[in-house]
């Protein structure tokens, strides 16, 4: 099929997928207002003729064909840096396709246990790459009582598990939580949420299926209202993406789409690999947002005439330090990359984990600085409608 255009991507989503939002069953997400922003965001990544980002979005495969760079397997530091650059200019609807890097980076380890699984991984990767499809990172199970293992829960279907093994495939049941962009991509790439023990073979499962596979149901939720005014919310209005509660109601998965079915020694391998690539994307996003915070803090301070205020300057200095620590950590992780036996390079695991921890541990303080600098205007500043109203606007 080759590269899709934005309109091709949008039409590809009208495929009979079963999805809900606010209690409403939505037969065609391309026509529903709740999905307008997330679909439009992801469609931007299909603009290969964009004068600024078109070249960054494309690369040549080993076959000489064009593909989206999200599928490029980095083999040099420069290619790894190109990936970082791409992800800083990419919607989360495309960024979650880093799940394919997680699979490909452990393909050889999987092959040592069961070569057929490794062949399935490569086949899926090439299928999605060559058809310009997007995949979601489907990893987090509803964990119930966290003192208990997966097979010890009162409800055996809290974790996704195999309920039937057949000659032509497996049948799975259960659910996954917090699945970003699940309704606006093409493939649900399911991974183990953690390592599994020998008595949990049914829960050691990994596979990929199309979103419209019978038995798959997605319940969407978003922290943002349905429509955010870009004037009042210049950043948030352009970054709305639903989180999916993905249900597998006795879903059949053919063997050629299975990457793990009971081989518990591979569960940790797959979970850790996805964790690394997911955290890398998280750190890239953290660098971008932290730099935005610095600029916002400076604007608010200048608006209030407090450029020389000692407290304001100290707060901005803390925000700058936070942003630079994250940026330098990401740079270090790429310069001190690690490499698989087959030559695929990936960010330094320790550096990425440390950066992700630092980001999360200090994020609330950065928001506190912004609140302190902005004051009550954060909540009570009149909106665009009041500004445009000739009667009230003249006072604003």
Annotate the PLM regions:
Residues 1-43:
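N-terminal-proximal low-complexity accessory segments that begin disordered
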Residues 30-49, 183-193:
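Short, surface-exposed, low-complexity cationic segments
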Residues 47-135, 181, 187:
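Internal helix-loop-helix
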Residues 106-175:
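Gly/Pro-rich turn-and-neighbor structural signature
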Residues 175, 179-228:
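A short core secondary-structure module
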Residues 229-324:
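Glycine-rich beta->alpha junctions and the first turn(s) of the following alpha-helix
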Residues 314-339, 358-361, 365, 371:
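Loop-to-helix element that buttresses phosphate recognition and phosphoryl-transfer chemistry
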Residues 350-396:
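Alpha-helix capping/hinge segments and adjacent helical runs
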């Amino acid at each position: 099929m080759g590269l899709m255009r934005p309109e091709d991507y949008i039409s590809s989503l009208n495929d009979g997928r079963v999805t809900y939002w606010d209690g409403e069953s939505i037969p065609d997400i391309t026509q529903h207002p709740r999905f307008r922003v997330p679909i439009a965001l992801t469609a931007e990544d299909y603009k290969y003729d964009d004068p600024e980002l078109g070249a960054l979005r494309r690369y040549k495969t080993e076959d000489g064909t064009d593909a989206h760079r999200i599928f490029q397997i980095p083999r040099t530091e420069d290619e790894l840096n190109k990936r970082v650059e791409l992800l800083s200019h990419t919607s989360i609807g495309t960024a979650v396709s880093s799940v394919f890097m997680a699979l490909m980076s452990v393909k050889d380890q999987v092959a040592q246990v069961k070569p057929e699984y490794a062949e399935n991984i490569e086949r899926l990767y090439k299928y999605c790459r060559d058809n310009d499809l997007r995949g979601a990172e489907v990893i987090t199970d509803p964990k119930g009582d966290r003192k208990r293992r997966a097979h010890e829960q009162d409800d055996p279907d809290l974790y996704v598990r195999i309920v039937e093994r057949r000659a032509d495939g497996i049948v799975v049941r259960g659910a996954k939580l917090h699945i970003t962009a699940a309704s606006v991509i093409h493939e649900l790439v399911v991974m183990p949420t953690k390592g599994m023990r020998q008595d949990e073979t049914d829960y050691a499962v990994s596979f990929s299926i199309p979103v419209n596979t019978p038995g798959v149901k997605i319940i969407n939720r978003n922290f943002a209202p349905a429509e955010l005014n870009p004037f009042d919310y210049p950043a948030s209005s352009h970054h709305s993406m639903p989180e999916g509660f993905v249900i597998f109601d006795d879903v059949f998965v053919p063997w050629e789409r299975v990457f793990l079915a009971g081989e518990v020694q591979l569960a940790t391998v797959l979970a850790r690999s996805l964790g690394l690539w997911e955290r890398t994307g998280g750190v890239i996003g953290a660098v971008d947002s932290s730099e935005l915070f610095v600029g916002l803090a400076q604007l608010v301070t200048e608006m209030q005439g407090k450029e020389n205020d000692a407290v304001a300057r100290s707060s901005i200095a803390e925000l700058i330090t936070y942003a630079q620590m994250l940026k330098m950590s990401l740079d270090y992780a790429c310069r001190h990359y690690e490499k698989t036996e087959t030559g695929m390079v990936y960010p330094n695991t320790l550096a990425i984990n440390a950066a992700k921890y630092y980001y999360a541990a200090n994020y609330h303080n950065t928001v506190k600085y912004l609140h302190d600098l902005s004051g009550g205007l954060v909540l009570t500043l009149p909106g665009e409608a009041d500004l445009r109203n000739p009667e009230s606007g003249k006072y604003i």
